[in-house]
Amino acid sequence: MTNWQGKNVTVAGLGVSGIPAARVLHGLGAVVTVVNDGDDERSRAQAADLEALGITVRLGDGATLPEGTELIVTTPGWQPDKPLFAAAAEAGVPVWGDVELAWRLRGPGSAPWLAVTGTNGKTTTVQMLASILTAAGLRTAAVGNIGVSLLDAVLGEETYDVLAVELSSYQLHWAPSLRAHSATVLNIAPDHLDWHGSMEAYTADKGRIYEGNRVACVYNVADKATEDLVRAADVEEGCRAVGFTLGTPGPSQLGVVEGILVDRAFVEDRQKNAQELAEVADVHPPAPHNIANALAAAALARAFGVPASAVRDGLRAFRPDAHRIAHVADVDGVTYIDDSKATNTHAAEASLAAYGSIVWIAGGLAKGASFDELVAKSAQRLRGVVLIGADRALIREALARHAPEVPVVDLDRTDTGAMPAAVQEARRLAVAGDTVLLAPACASMDMFANYNKRGDAFAEAVRGLGA
């Protein structure tokens, strides 16, 4: 669709991507109708702003396909089994996401995309990648789920040499035309299964990121599912499979040798040679899963032709966002770490693996997850556990099965005041040399607006210990 004038487009959902999409489409000359399930005060205020522009908004009815619709542009949160999409399929109306819209609106000579997805580590990897690209002197931005919106990056006045793009499984589901320069799936673990319907569907949507890649499909050697997705992808001729590993890399891989990040993929005679990129100490923090993120970012940057020195300089300059394995304080010889971003079992497992003797604060909304494997793998590291949140019983039961000797404090409350109580209980269980780790393995919305608020509450409670 290149001529938007007079096209009838329905935007499914208000919010951070729906509203910008509606504005952009209206500006292109489309006849835009926004449909939204909710009809609350916030939705009505958003609707009023759009209606002032001449955009039609229909609140409280997101199920009915507006008459004459030629295209639906959906926000990522709308599940594929929504009645609206069934009606669209029956009527032969295509459905795009905001990523698909941005991809289709790119102009001639637009910046190529280096794309990142995975169950965990997406944001950190994209930010590392942007830091490396910047160190190489390239005009770039971290876009997608973070930083600049994709629509702004594609349509804005600022020009870029290359974009570092974070993509969720939701976004990839609705982006059939996306063709990245190079891409990576960092890891695959059960998450968002309520949205996708099955692990198979979730994995398949992640794998869409490799379709049509031109230069490199970067996979995790330790996660065979990611390599399987590369093998299944239909890519351009000459596109290479490149692995990253925390071990010694083979040919066409990046890895670690004696504390050095090395490249055996983007070098001459990769059967015999390796290029030093950076030291493990250049990665902040140097936890194993974060080193893996750095290797993936380095692989994408190297695929774009970035020199080794820029990888080193970019990693040295990078600092992670708050609530990602963030050091809060040391109190009475105990280290307090905020990893509130660990909202699923895979992320929590990586966080727990980075420390020795741990008092673990966990719980929240489980999103259908099982905790048996997580607890079984982490049991030997646990000094004690403090449970909070709506689904804490699921973790308690897994602890009873796989770590019955570990002391567990079950806080039977879901108000925000539970966090100071949890920190006090963790302090009581911990001894000098231990780490008190907030790695909830669950979503936060039962108690907090988001994981940031949860992490803030933890940090505030910890700082109160030293007062």
From Swiss-Prot:
Reaction(s) the record says it catalyses: UDP-N-acetyl-alpha-D-muramoyl-L-alanine + D-glutamate + ATP = UDP-N-acetyl-alpha-D-muramoyl-L-alanyl-D-glutamate + ADP + phosphate + H(+)
GO CC, any one term: cytoplasm
Pfam families xrefs: Mur_ligase_C, Mur_ligase_M
Known EC number: 6.3.2.9
Key words, A-Z: ATP-binding, Cell cycle, Cell division, Cell shape, Cell wall biogenesis/degradation, Cytoplasm, Ligase, Nucleotide-binding, Peptidoglycan synthesis
Biological process, per Gene Ontology: cell division; cell wall organization; peptidoglycan biosynthetic process; regulation of cell shape
Location (main, coarse): cytoplasm
Localization in the cell: Cytoplasm
One of the record's GO molecular function terms: UDP-N-acetylmuramoylalanine-D-glutamate ligase activity
Residues annotated to bind ATP: G118, T119, N120, G121, K122, T123, T124
Entries under Gene3D superfamilies matching the protein: Mur ligase, C-terminal domain (3.90.190.20), Mur-like, catalytic domain (3.40.1190.10), NAD(P)-binding Rossmann-like Domain (3.40.50.720)
InterPro entries per record: Folylpolyglutamate_synth_CS (IPR018109), Mur-like_cat_sf (IPR036565), Mur_ligase_C (IPR004101), Mur_ligase_C_dom_sf (IPR036615), Mur_ligase_cen (IPR013221), MurD (IPR005762)
The organism's place on the tree of life at top rank: Bacteria
Enzyme class: ligase
Listed pathway(s): Cell wall biogenesis; peptidoglycan biosynthesis
HAMAP family per the UniProt record, alphabetical: MurD
Family stated for the protein in its record: Belongs to the MurCDEF family.
Function: Cell wall formation. Catalyzes the addition of glutamate to the nucleotide precursor UDP-N-acetylmuramoyl-L-alanine (UMA).
Protein name per its UniProtKB record: UDP-N-acetylmuramoylalanine--D-glutamate ligase
Organism: Streptomyces avermitilis (strain ATCC 31267 / DSM 46492 / JCM 5070 / NBRC 14893 / NCIMB 12804 / NRRL 8165 / MA-4680)
